[in-house]
Amino acid sequence: MSTEQVLNQKDSQLPKRARIVIIGGGVGGTSVAYHLAQMGESDVVLVDRNDLTSGSTFHSAGMVGQLRADPTLTKMNMHSASLYRELQQSETPPSWVECGSIKIASSPERMEEIRRQIGWAKTFGLDLHEISLTEIKERFPLINLEGVVGGCFMTTDGQVDPSQLALSMAAGARKKGVQIHTFTRVLEIKTIAGRVSAVVTDKGTIECEIVVNCGGIYAAEIARLVDVRIPIVPMSHQYLITENFLDPNAPIMASLRDPDNLIYFRQEVQGLLMGGYERTSKAWKTTRESLDEIPKNFNNMLLAEDWDRFEEIAANSQMRVPKMAELGIKSFINGPEAFTPDNEFCLGETEVGSFYVAAGYCAHGIAGAGGIGKVMAEWILGNEPPMDLWHMDIRRFGPAYRSPAFTLDRIQENYEQYYDIHYPQEERQSCRPHKVSPAYDWHKDHQAEFGEKASWERVNFYRNHVGTESNRPYGWAGKNWSSAVQLEHAATREGAGIFDESSFAKLEVSGLRASQFLEFVCANDVVKGVGRAVYTQALNSKGGIECDFTVTQIENDRFLIITGTAFAHHDAGWLHKLRREHGFDDVQIEDRTEQLAIFGIWGPKSREILQSLTSSDLSNQAFPFLHSKEIDINGVTIRATRITYVGELGWELYIPVKDAAPIWQLLYKSGGFPCGYRAIESLRLEKGYLAWGGEINTEYNPYEAGLAFAISKKKSDFYGAKALSNLKSPTRRLVQIVFDDIKQVPLGSEPIRSNNQVIGRIKSGGQGYTVNKAIAFAYLPIEFTEPGTKLDVEFFGVWHQGYVAQM
């Protein structure tokens, strides 16, 4: 099947108008077109600068594995496999073969990872199971089992011809009315009032309402036409195909992955396809100083063979499959694949209205293509993410990723660790430090162990806070654990912990209609008078939790929003979107994150310490909970808000950056015990406080999450209120599951069962040092949420009993 056979309209005229224009004709663009058409939207034009599949699709390896660490991506890949199975029965089949996949462990640590993955596969109903060495050999007879500890087999994984897949989806889209125009180069994207309005090509201009950038390795270049930065880098990715030698009448072998040796195999006709992830990565047409500059004529082309970088992969392949040493090589593929800084897709609407992106497939785009097309079509037609897509949402990449150096260094680090075992609380090391708190030097001098989040250096804990090792968790949870966290936790519960939260995002909303705008955006009543602070959610149209933050009224028409470190770009993007789409153009939204430091002081002695530094009255009567006012410390006027994220008396202090470092030192000298973010995590988990992106996201509503107290009883016209009114009787609820053994710490994604039936999965977990328990959050069917209900949770293949606690 060729492009011309699919299109049969090579010389057709470009339309002057379409509702949606898709740029890019690889598996991403054709999947978006296919799914839009399947959902009834056929006023769609797809354009490609060359032939369909001429970018990265044609040289993809075509392996389809479904299980991923992210639950949403797993669901997307499951849709892909289901779709490819269905397309195989169509008039334009994509050569889908459901051969199954084997993953082997060449180390005991990898076998632990496999057993953990088998556990979370149960929560999706996927048939992933451990297999013996004998069965590994039966399913992949060429393997040398030396050093293999064990393995697992996924029955419904498979492989597909990438080009035929794209053409199959293109054919399906065309049948429903989508127009496809190849050899049509995009020159300009026009905007009006912050929204796309037209796509200018070398064949003419198409007026449109929506543009979807599926440009593959060219996606960043296309985005620059509207001044949007997409942090992707084309990376050299290599594999080879051997000469034919297998019996053409034998069943196709399962694919094989040996991550400890960085390699993968699948059958290609009667030969083998073998590739891997080199420890020495190489970017293409990108440097630390410049953006990508891909040649205009790079179509249906490959890069030069780089055997020096591939040498380790080749040697490992011959060790694992000795036959490789005897086989001739039919072709060696070195093709550029677009990677992102965290090895996840880059999807969604950008800061330019109705300009969407679906790019950065990180060499697993064939497995994800079907799911990408589905969620993007739903996102476009529904005007918001259809499920929890945060880990793939372009809004997760903040201003730091406008830096070519930061983006490239992080992408190379992650590429080289692609097949590593990733333990909890693992930290990336590239391009650090990038952003720091005003008190950074003090923290460094006092033995702070830093972590990084959204390019900010943050204190995890202080190494000189040495405690007992007796509570070190079992297994993986203990890998990056520190006894310092327990000391800092106790210091906060019993005295006063001081926390540098300067990385928290601060958004200022102002204007004559700022109050009206925020009352529309937020589910809670946020306008309670100057000096009042409110905890609230912002909901999507389905009643799901889009944002979770506090709002403080600074003046009649000026408000300060405090949200998580990683959510500045996301939350600001949501506010800008609602402002643009609902007629609040006169409202200003400004990011003040780098202008203000935030220090938290919490614990029973916090008032005593803070009162010693200010003449302002901090008594309960003068300074109630959720109130905010200016106070003076050391001759500096700062804002103090009585609020807590750890369940103790305390304040957050908002301080101009230039004045912040001396105030931190005063808090310390006055008796504050310096603590890090890992103590915050333990403290808030113990008190049942929630984190967006952890326990709450767009897939859950406030009633399910136990946040009904943060929903207004007075108004019914806030965004998402209509949907929320029908969700007051949830069928599932968020619960805490407690384990009496504090060292039995859940990591997340573990299956939960009752009476041998899987009923859910763990969302997050940790240690509660005050209660001396291990604690987890999970959403469970309502009949299992009664406090005291006993449940089993699987840890690395072994079931342990916990029970539902009172929240």
List PLM regions with ranges.
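Extreme N-terminal leader/targeting segments of oxidoreductases
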Residues: M1-I20, Q38-S42
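Flavin (FAD/FMN) cofactor-binding and adjacent substrate-gating region
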Residues: S2, L83-E86, S106-T182, E188-R195, ...
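Flavin-dependent oxidoreductases
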Residues: S31, G65, I189-A304, E312-K323, ...
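Glycine-rich FAD pyrophosphate-binding loop
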Residues: A37-T57
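Dinucleotide-binding Rossmann-like beta1-alpha1 core, especially the glycine-rich loop
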Residues: G62-R139, D260-F265, V269-L273, A283, ...
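Glycine-rich phosphate/pyrophosphate-binding beta-alpha loops
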Residues: M63, A69, D157-Q159, L262-Y264, ...
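C-terminal catalytic lobe of FAD-dependent flavoproteins
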Residues: V269, M301-I421, E427-C431
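Glycine/proline-enriched, intrinsically flexible loops and inter-domain linkers
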Residues: M387-D388, I394-M807
